[in-house]
């Protein structure tokens, strides 16, 4: 097993052996679900070593799922059951519905499901049987499932991210159109009020091209309006969010704005649930990949497993550490809303990360490698601040 997979597996709240021991004492049956948009294939593994039984296929509808749970409850005399299915585009509706019936359900990480190298046959039936069998043996790794509140905030931050991507694409198209026709802006900064005033003065020889310009400009403005609206909604939602105090604590860090802080916690939830900062780094795919055998040890690029949204946010935040460490007015205003201990951790982090960025850059490292290394350590400091905000031990040496 590679180091990345081993470390990633350790992120879970219990080991495979612990889950196996607990499952064997609690659950009478293990139900594998291969969930698709319109259907769910169902397999059942009873306690023991018997081969899983294929139960059949049901529609992916609430009524059909309720009927299935009732039938299985009667079959096992009301004893607890464990349902398992892979994380995917169908979300967590099945999870919440099964949990509401009093049975257990786990959504498992597809990338961490053990698979035989020579197995080349894949069907819904075989997948359901595999999930039931591996669930019984305790070899599945469950993912963290957000609460409905958490999922709503995550949908909001992802919508803002999608609209921002549309805005950037609209800007690129407008810029390419202008460059293609020799219309170059002489000002310092684009997409400012001055830049948009200049766009109003641009004229083309043909009316058709003038219409094209107006459409491109309108597309940029419309995208900006959507982004601004979603960001306003994020600010409005924050005070009532259960993780609002943690967001404010993370904002004491350089490079972590309200948008970045909400994105991190919307995607990961309470990051203080990780036992150590190394587990969080591995979960985000910010640790080096490794292929070691015998006496040789070879490390490669980062694993890029886990949540890519948070990884992107942290890498972007890491760029701010290329400048010397200092307490700017904006950072100080955000930090003053937090405790002295959190302020001390944030300042210690800034001094260390700015110095690390400078040292790595001086060695000739590629800029992307430098920012990734800084992002990895930044994740560790965010974990310490989250633990402090939640009243959990973190072992940071920074003191007020």
What spans do the regions from the language model cover?
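A detector of single, family-specific signature residues
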Residues: 1-400
């Amino acid at each position: 097993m590679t180091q990345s997979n081993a470390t990633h597996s350790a992120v879970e709240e219990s080991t495979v052996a612990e889950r196996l021991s607990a499952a064997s004492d609690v659950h009478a049956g293990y139900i594998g679900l291969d969930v698709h948009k319109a259907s769910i294939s169902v397999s059942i593994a009873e306690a023991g070593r018997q081969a899983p039984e294929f139960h059949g296929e049901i529609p992916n509808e609430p009524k059909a799922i309720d009927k299935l749970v009732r039938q299985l409850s009667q079959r096992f005399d009301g004893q607890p059951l464990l349902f398992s299915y892979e994380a995917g585009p169908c979300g967590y509706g099945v999870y919440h519905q099964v949990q509401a019936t009093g049975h257990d359900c786990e959504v498992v990480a597809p990338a961490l499901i053990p698979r035989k190298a020579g197995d080349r046959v894949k069907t819904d039936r075989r997948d359901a049987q595999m999930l039931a069998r591996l669930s019984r043996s305790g070899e599945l790794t469950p993912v963290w499932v957000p609460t409905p509140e958490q999922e709503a905030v995550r949908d909001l931050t992802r919508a803002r991210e999608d609209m921002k991507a549309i805005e950037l694409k609209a800007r690129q198209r407008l810029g390419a159109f202008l460059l293609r026709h020799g219309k170059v802006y002489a000002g310092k900064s684009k997409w400012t009020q001055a830049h948009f005033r200049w766009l109003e003065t641009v004229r083309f020889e043909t009316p058709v091209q003038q219409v094209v310009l107006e459409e491109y400009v309108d597309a940029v403005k419309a995208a900006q309006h959507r982004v601004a609206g979603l960001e306003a909604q994020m600010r409005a939602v924050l005070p009532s969010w259960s993780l609002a105090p943690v967001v404010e604590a993370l904002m004491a860090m350089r490079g972590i704005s309200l948008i970045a802080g909400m994105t991190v916690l919307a995607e990961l939830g309470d990051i203080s649930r990780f036992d150590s900062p190394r587990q969080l780094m591995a979960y985000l795919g910010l640790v080096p990949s490794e292929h070691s055998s015998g006496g040789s040890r070879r490390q490669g690029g980062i694993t890029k497993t886990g949540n890519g949204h948070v990884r992107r946010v942290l890498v972007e935040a890491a760029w701010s550490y290329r400048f010397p460490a200092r307490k700017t007015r904006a950072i100080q205003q955000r930090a003053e809303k937090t405790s002295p201990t959190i302020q001390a951790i944030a300042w210690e982090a800034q001094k260390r990360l700015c110095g690390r960025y400078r040292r790595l850059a001086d060695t000739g490292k590629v800029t992307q490698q430098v920012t990734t290394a800084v992002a990895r350590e930044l994740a560790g400091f965010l974990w310490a601040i989250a633990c402090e905000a939640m009243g959990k031990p973190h072992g940071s040496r920074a003191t007020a």
